[in-house]
Amino acid sequence: IIDTVRDFILYLKLCNRTGKIIPRYENENWTFTELLYEAPYLKSYQDEEDEEDEEADCLEYIDNTDKIIYLYYQDDKCVGKVKLRKNWNRYAYIEDIAVCKDFRGQGIGSALINISIEWAKHKNLHGLMLETQDNNLIACKFYHNCGFKIGSVDTMLYANFENNFEKAVFWYLRF
């Protein structure tokens, strides 16, 4: 089990921030425009302290029928993951989805979304939901291209953190 858990831990230390979305709610519909940064920057997501927490978190998924982890392997290397749980609102909540940087653009993220859809339908859920930040332009565009729609924007979720300029964007894919 521990080897599987270690396979699950993908170190996505740095994420390139090239721009952000500017969501707009009008006539009961969310739209967004893109703003590209003149100077992209790197954001760190995980440090060494998180490894132990991540292993413990993964163990919660074993033999839990309301949670699942899918790992994507290529050439015997774990290059992608998605963590899902059954949410109270009859959606499958994507807690984490990641593809190693060198393997992006090869359809792995789409494959992880597709297996998530299959799991949610098998659980008789009504769709997928997830949260990301407005300044994760690459992820926002990916979710939009997969058919997700913005359901809400939370301006206070990250207010007590160092990067308190970020807004939480909640995305939904209904079926």
Predicted regions: what is each one?
Residues 99, 105-122, 141-145:
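Conserved acetyl-CoA-binding loop-helix of GNAT-fold acetyltransferases
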Residues 15, 72, 104, 110-111, ...:
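Preference for well-ordered, secondary-structure-rich cores of eukaryotic proteins
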Residues 126, 133-140, 146-149, 156-175:
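C-terminal "cap" of GNAT-fold acetyltransferases
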Residues 78, 93, 124-126, 147:
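Short loop/turn motifs at secondary-structure junctions
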Residues 7-91, 95, 100-101, 113-114, ...:
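Acetyl-CoA-dependent GNAT
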